[in-house]
Amino acid sequence: MRAWTGLVMLGLLAACKPADKPPADETAVPSAPPVPEAKADGPAAATTAVALDAEGLRFIDKASGKASLLAFGVPREQAEKALANVAGKADDRSDNNECGAGPMAFTRFDAMTLNFQDGKFVGWFLGNEKGAKDYSTASGIGIGTTRAKAKQSVTITDIEDSTLGEEFSIGTGDTVVGGMFAEPGDAAKVDALFAGANCFFR
């Protein structure tokens, strides 16, 4: 009897054993997670565009074309409020006390980062991230613009021996927008744009 009971228990355990998983399809390509869209949900997002400028950021009324400059030197609170009105709530704020230009604070709105020193707006940096397509210069240059296309509307000055890579500038004197191409050549695309004071280590 005891032997029969043991056989029954072995049978139950075998029945409860999970089935072997089917072999994974080795040819299947893992899918990348979807990239979230930029917010651009500020109250003025539908009516206002933001243009990149060597002197700050220009806010342009889409209906009338009227532009107003958010100039370097304005208080941090004013700059943050102006951009949030279009880009939506800031993603984060941070600080770096070891920047080449001196201690600096930052407020990031998707691809756009505003730079501050002593509580004043002193620069901006646009990276190749979500939301970058919402910004361009008055001449239409933005992230993803090729060197060949940019040269049709502005003069591109390459920064020789730059430690930042394929660095270039647009403009002269104090009214310069800087940038970086992803690689050499006319087919290279703009990978970053910036103006004013930035946290670069050259």
Describe these PLM feature segments:
Residues 12-15:
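C-terminal motif of bacterial Sec signal peptides marking the signal peptidase cleavage site
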Residues 17-164, 186-202:
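Short helix/turn-capping signatures at newly exposed starts of structured segments
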Residues 166-186:
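Low-complexity, intrinsically disordered Gly/Pro/Thr-rich segments
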Residues 2-8:
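Sec-dependent signal peptide recognition
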